[in-house]
Amino acid sequence: MTEVLWPSAVEKQALGLAARLARQGVRPGERVLLTGENSSSFVAALLALCHLDVSIVLAAPQLAADQLAHMTRTANVRWAVAGATADGIPLPGSAVLDLTAPAAPDPADPADPAAAGTIVLDRWESRADAVVMWSSGTTGAPKSVVKSGRAVLENSRVTAAHMGYTRDDVLAPLLPFSHQYGMSLLLIWWLTGCGLLVAPYRRLEPALTAIAESGATVVDGTPPTYHGMLTLFARNPAHLDGLRKVRMWCVGGAPLNRPLAERFRDATGQPLLDGYGMTETGNIALALPDLAEGCGRPLPGVEVRVRASDEDAGEGEVGEVEVRTPGRLEGYLRPDGSLAPYDEPWFRTRDLGRIDGNGVLHVYGRMNAVHRLGHTLYPEYLERRAEECGAPVKVVALDDERAGAVLVFFVQDAVHDERVWRGRLRACLASYERPNAVVTLPEFPVNRNGKVDVNALKELAAALLRGGGDGR
């Protein structure tokens, strides 16, 4: 039976967890690690920790023991609330609460704020280090990002209002709760008072069944998730019959390419609503059903500019996206756990994008410039150009002493071979933009966050070139 979580029911579980943690000695301001798979217990634990006014350190449950040890050491973690990974946490057993064994509220001490009848977020909202999250590290080493409660909650409120969520909605996040995107949706659910479906996001077929049974109205996922959906729709079109109540299909976590967007609209009759946000800034811009272009316009109170050659870019000109927002980070943690404040008014995203004549933000990906044959190229901008040929493309640039860079194009296509794609790319790219090698793959590798595993592709590219291959 598919279960939809409603705030009033989860609140009781959260108060029980809060009371149990308080009895163990958890105090306001202490750093508490929160890790675990998506579950009602994880949702309750997040609310309990907010209620206790602690500094929440979010960690993915798939992390190796040495990575968890690094996080707990850097963040000066005192306690942990965890699920199946509890045994691998480098803390005394008495400091770890098993997320899979929640307790009921203890009415013995009604004066204890943890035993109060409602979850209160006011104190946590005033905390400067309310959340410590690690950026995904898709293209480099992860950074420990410190966010205030005010930044996190206000961004959630603005997002909820912008998207038009109501108490009648049922949200279905097909992504991990232990990251910025997932946590944001949990807080939006709580603030809105709507329903929440906890679906098995790594197993799409049962997830689609749960969406249909629950009457979910808003679905969120990453591009690979929607690629998987389209495969299931093609195999069994009956899946679509149960999804008629979904009014918004939202996508984030990685750039949305045009072929995927067009295929999804063709299959469902509805657009994929792209969004743009970062761990450091929260949500920045979100597309809407009546403006399903690019990443939409910036949220109220969020300013976005595009800079090219140290000056503001012209309308439609591509450059680095910079953001000024109340939702930005307080700073990063130093190796000793102290805060290195981020004081710049504008946050440099290191993402490449443009703003069109309607004020819509278009983001192409990371701003990793390479120099090749006397030209400055941006691999992720080349990806968007190449995808006009009809399939998802990832471009890996490797250093080359003579040319400056060697370009390997990976194409997600299980039907056509490299020779076909060389011809297509030759027609849509300038000579200095064309690949040295083309590799077709039935599916791109993905990491634990559901994003394309760029490091795995780099290893494939390096191995190809070491072996003298050219992808033909």
Regions found by a protein language model. Give the residues of each.
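Conserved AMP-binding A3 loop
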Residues: 4-8, 130-157
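Conserved AMP-binding/adenylate-forming
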Residues: 19-63, 174-176, 376
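Conserved pre-ATP/AMP-binding loop-to-beta segment of ANL
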Residues: 108-134, 140-141, 164-170
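Conserved AMP-binding/adenylation subdomain of ANL enzymes
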Residues: 153-170, 178-218, 232
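Gly/Ser/Thr-rich phosphate-binding loop
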Residues: 216-221, 232-292, 303
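Conserved ATP/PPi-binding loop(s) of AMP-dependent carboxylate-activating enzymes
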Residues: 297-301, 311-344, 375-377
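AMP-binding/adenylate-forming catalytic core of the ANL superfamily
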Residues: 325, 352-433
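Conserved C-terminal "lid"/linker of ANL adenylate-forming enzymes
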Residues: 396, 408-410, 421-472
